[in-house]
Curated annotation (Swiss-Prot):
<dbReference type="InterPro" id="IPR037104">
    <property type="entry name" value="Annexin_sf"/>
</dbReference>
<dbReference type="GO" id="GO:0005509">
    <property type="term" value="F:calcium ion binding"/>
</dbReference>
<feature type="repeat" description="Annexin 2">
    <location>
        <begin position="113"/>
        <end position="184"/>
    </location>
</feature>
<dbReference type="GO" id="GO:0005737">
    <property type="term" value="C:cytoplasm"/>
</dbReference>
<feature type="repeat" description="Annexin 1">
    <location>
        <begin position="41"/>
        <end position="112"/>
    </location>
</feature>
<dbReference type="InterPro" id="IPR001464">
    <property type="entry name" value="Annexin"/>
</dbReference>
<comment type="function">
    <text>May act as a low affinity receptor for acetylcholine.</text>
</comment>
<comment type="similarity">
    <text>Belongs to the annexin family.</text>
</comment>
<feature type="repeat" description="Annexin 3">
    <location>
        <begin position="197"/>
        <end position="266"/>
    </location>
</feature>
<comment type="subunit">
    <text>Homodimer.</text>
</comment>
<dbReference type="InterPro" id="IPR009116">
    <property type="entry name" value="ANX9"/>
</dbReference>
<dbReference type="GO" id="GO:0001786">
    <property type="term" value="F:phosphatidylserine binding"/>
</dbReference>
<feature type="repeat" description="Annexin 4">
    <location>
        <begin position="270"/>
        <end position="341"/>
    </location>
</feature>
<dbReference type="GO" id="GO:0012506">
    <property type="term" value="C:vesicle membrane"/>
</dbReference>
<dbReference type="InterPro" id="IPR018502">
    <property type="entry name" value="Annexin_repeat"/>
</dbReference>
<keyword id="KW-0677">Repeat</keyword>
<dbReference type="GO" id="GO:0005634">
    <property type="term" value="C:nucleus"/>
</dbReference>
Amino acid sequence: MSVTHGKMGLSLTQEILSHLGLANKTAAWGTLGTLRTFLSFSADKDVQRLLKAIAGQGVDRIAILDVLTNRSREQRQLISRAFHERTQQDLLKSLQAALSGNLERIVVALLQPAAHLDARELRTALKGSGSAEDVALEILATRTPPQLQECLAVYKHNFQVDAAEDIKSETRGILRDLLLALAKGGREAYTGIIDYNLAAQDVQALKQAEGPSTERTWVLVFTQRNPEHLVRVLNQYQWYTGHGLEKTVRARFHGAACVALLNLASVIRNTPLYFADKLHQALQETEPNYQALMRILISRSETDLLSIRAEFRKKFGKSLYSSLQDAVKGDCRSALLALCRAEDL
């Protein structure tokens, strides 16, 4: 289809320039994560070091963190298996017995398979924490389709209920509809073909969906279209109306529904910036939100934490590493700094 111009379309040059941010460029070793596969990996040597760290009178926390924060998640799982084969004991339980507090929590998160950690966080968000529009949406909206499928399968196995059933019972209104649609994983795949007519149709549909009983349109567009298409819709909406879609959301919705839609728009526009904002918010609380810090740093350490660091530094004028140093105390700080990896000057 032809490229449109004027208010409803972005030029080809604008399209290209919008994708040139350094925060989105893969690092020299082929990943935007801070944590890579440890090349000199030996599960047996790591097991020996961990056994030594917990066998004496005092627990060697530095040694434990040095091993766990310098191995990929797959390598940590291999260490757990090797530990069990050698000792007939569970590594996770052994470390839990030796540690306590936030350090214990971060070690548990490091040793759990990603899907198990996501399932646990999703369950906590839906059952009693009042954070469905925040944590539940984070997990459902930012995981890849295979990651989401595995998370939901683990959720059903561990808690004997479908996540969809908990969403239905614990949320309501457009928030419930958004979470259910995201949990179905029905978002269209990006084909590489730009459909400018569909983008224009979606912009018009959202403009006309500002009255009552139009929530279904918002859910459909936000949860079914592929992210690349949605970025174009958000840009064209602003081009056409003179204001961002977020302004319309704030005027049209309230409470959890408003927060959920704003969060989803943030994920669509710039996922690393979305996580940078969440990390900054977690650090600004009177007591740092350790659960949020742990969840985000661990879950993004092998995917895009370098991009998140770049967005954090650009927006807040201070590196994520320095912010963690200033706000977090104790052994937990050492673990989070190890995942963050380095200062951004």
